[in-house]
A protein has these predicted regions:
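Acidic, metal/ion-coordinating pockets
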Residues: 1-178
Length: 178
């Protein structure tokens, strides 16, 4: 969702369009603050996540427990990696502490981690660190889906990058003629 506003962030109205279309959760990353009006909206919208490893006091939340219509409870954790990205709190320690200690994870039927980052190696390292502790680790940020979807040795689903929701007749969602 972080590139929904013409490639730069997301607005409250776009966010609401997603939810009206049936989207359960919108994760973000390094473009989360590109549209200033999202700052006042993100605190009141638990379905819109910003990376969990932003410093304490940052508006919004990086994780939430969602209850599906079936009653199935899914914890979603949005984390931003650091290689070639802006320097945030250590994503590995942050997600490790969260998985170990947060009550949200103890009541979830599934835990899904969105690993927003540039480097495939960093996403893979996080996947292996969390293998057997979460249901899935799915990377985001590069706009290009990877063909490496698999189950890791201890049962965690993994994909280096899910790609983008956008126009494939484009350059990572932007005008190919620009």
């Amino acid at each position: 969702g972080e590139n929904a506003a013409g490639g730069f962030g997301i607005t409250p109205s776009i966010c609401e369009e997603f939810f009206e279309a049936g989207v359960n959760v919108v994760t973000t990353g390094n473009h989360v603050w590109d549209q200033r009006e999202i700052i006042s909206h993100i605190d009141s919208e638990p379905r819109l996540l910003r990376p969990h490893n932003y410093p304490d006091g940052t508006p919004g939340s990086g994780a939430h427990l969602f209850t599906m219509a079936s009653g199935y409870r899914v914890a979603v954790v949005n984390i931003m990696l650091r290689l070639f990205m802006e320097p945030l709190d250590d994503p590995f320690r942050c997600v490790d502490r969260f998985i170990q200690g947060h009550s949200l994870c103890k009541t979830a039927d599934a835990i899904v981690v969105d690993a927003h980052g540039e480097a495939s190696s960093e996403k893979q390292a996080l996947g292996y660190m969390l293998d057997g502790r979460v249901t899935a680790v799915v990377g985001s940020h590069t706009h290009v889906p990877t063909a490496d979807t698999r189950i890791l040795p201890n049962g965690t689903g993994f994909q280096t990058d899910a790609g983008m929701c956008g126009d494939y007749d484009s350059v990572i969602g932007g005008d190919k003629g620009s």
